[in-house]
Amino acid sequence: MVGPVRPQIVLFGSSIVQYSFTDRGWGATLADLYSRTADIILRGYAGWNSRFALKVLHQVFPKDAVIQPSLVIVYFGGNDSTHPHPSGHGPHVPLSEFIENMRKIGEHLLSLSDKTRVIFLTPPPMNEKQIEIVFGDAIKGRSNELCRPYAEELLNLCREINVKGIDIWTAIQQQDDWLNSCFTDGIHFTAKASEIVVKEILKVLRGADWKPSLYWKSLPVEFPFDFDAPNSISLHDLELTRNNHFESPHLVSLCEQELTRNEQLEPPHPVSLCDHELTRNEQLEPPHPVSLCDHELTQNEQLEPPQPTARL
């Protein structure tokens, strides 16, 4: 462990969380914003549903830990909401069980300490045609209409147990041309979708009446910018200026600013998460479409009972 101890912000969920540190992902952006004020801790598990999350909840978030997180941002539901397969296999979790699982997750997290705050993210929408193009028959049983009730009921649960809820399902669909601009493979986020998620999270943190505030502009900066002349420049002001594009609708979008700064171009066509991961690791693509589960199993050299639908 390194010191001094900072507030901990934990991201807990499935592939939307695990891959949030890829190119300009929402987790990476939060880590950038909180780089001198808090630690962003990733606990993402691609392929998981809320049922799996419950199995490890007390291991990931033990009640007897000396240091408890200040904030936990939780995402599950995209896999739970897939269409059930006749075999009974696959990631589907019935809506009533999903809500009960999320209730248990929320109540456990709130019990960790008086200062632990919780945000639930709803399942996002998806581009069904893009999923078909990218994955072919490898992924079946996913649609916006299947996601909708999971998102709606999760928001109802948030109000019931006093957890902040963010309606990602609606927020992304309010973006112009969201079907073409928000997904790499019909399911996982582009930089544009991640920007939407970050702005929604910051909106909640800015408006919450939590004491202390966990909004990035409110947390104290760790150590002065210059020990020899600590008053010569305000690091806080410097950081606010650099990151103010998250608050102002009149400035260039985060995506455009990042692309210009890094002289990178967005892929000319949607690419699957598998393609992205294999390219990043200089590996070869198999000659046929592979599911995210297949990719994860190969990567970790583990065996799983055959699943008719891929998990995300």
UniProtKB/Swiss-Prot annotation:
One of its GO terms (cellular component) is extracellular region. It is found in: Secreted. Its main location: secreted. It is an enzyme of class 3 (hydrolase). Residues 1-22 form the signal peptide. Its EC number is 3.1.1.-. Residues 285-312 are annotated as: Disordered. Glycans are attached at N79. GO terms for biological process: lipid catabolic process. One of its GO terms (molecular function) is hydrolase activity, acting on ester bonds. PANTHER family: ISOAMYL ACETATE-HYDROLYZING ESTERASE 1, SGNH HYDROLASE-TYPE ESTERASE DOMAIN-CONTAINING PROTEIN. Belongs to the 'GDSL' lipolytic enzyme family. This is GDSL esterase/lipase At2g38180. The lineage of its organism: Eukaryota, Viridiplantae, Streptophyta, Embryophyta, Tracheophyta.
